[in-house]
């Protein structure tokens, strides 16, 4: 079943996707957040995940995402294992909620950072794909400031995602977040007018 009212929102780390989501929410749009679902699933399945990665990733029976991240962002094989485990579960949850929202006959957004990496429209049959874009150099600059990560760590994480320019070429609409918050608001408004 095609999700006629669903719009996938994607981007890379540091492109401003979270800020864009806040703008959309302030306009009254419903958002299904793949990352929030992933965090819930990590906790629900923490013991199975710990069986694979070792009990060091648990603290008082709670999964420590930083410790898990330190493992998976340094080892492509381990990242693949985690993604192969989580992505089908995330997809199941997202689609179940999306089918419910379809009944409202109003546009809503699926916030999926790894939209293209997990199969794009084959996995999530949305009407449009919107990319929140910022150049790789700007992503790195923002992540250095925001997350206080070392540049090597940032480059490792970026390497785990499809290149932002590839995503740009595959998207139906681009929200360019290379400037100010005021400009981002204008870009979002411009996009929302295309939905009318």
Swiss-Prot record:
ATP binds at residues 14-19. It catalyses: 3'-dephospho-CoA + ATP = ADP + CoA + H(+). Residues 6-196 form the DPCK domain. Pathway: Cofactor biosynthesis; coenzyme A biosynthesis; CoA from (R)-pantothenate: step 5/5. It is found in: Cytoplasm. GO terms for biological process: coenzyme A biosynthetic process. The keyword Kinase applies. Its main location: cytoplasm. Catalyzes the phosphorylation of the 3'-hydroxyl group of dephosphocoenzyme A to form coenzyme A. This is Dephospho-CoA kinase. The gene is coaE.
């Amino acid at each position: 079943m095609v999700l006629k009212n669903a719009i996938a929102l994607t981007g890379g780390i540091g492109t401003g996707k979270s800020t864009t989501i806040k703008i959309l929410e302030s306009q009254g749009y419903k958002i299904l957040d793949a990352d929030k679902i992933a965090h819930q699933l990590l906790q629900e399945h923490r013991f199975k995940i710990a069986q694979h990665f070792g009990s060091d990733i648990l603290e008082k029976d709670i999964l420590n995402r930083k410790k898990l991240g330190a493992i998976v962002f340094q080892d492509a094989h381990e990242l693949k294992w985690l993604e192969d485990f989580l992505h089908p579960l995330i997809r199941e949850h997202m689609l179940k909620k999306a089918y419910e929202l379809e009944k409202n006959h109003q546009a809503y957004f699926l916030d999926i950072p790894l939209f293209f990496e997990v199969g794009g429209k084959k996995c999530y049959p949305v009407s449009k794909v919107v990319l929140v874009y910022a150049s790789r150099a700007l992503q790195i600059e923002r992540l250095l400031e925001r997350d206080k990560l070392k540049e090597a760590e940032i480059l490792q994480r970026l390497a785990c995602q499809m290149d932002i320019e590839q995503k740009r070429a595959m998207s139906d609409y681009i929200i360019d977040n290379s400037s100010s918050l005021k400009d981002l608001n204008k870009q979002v408004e411009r996009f929302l007018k295309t939905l009318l």
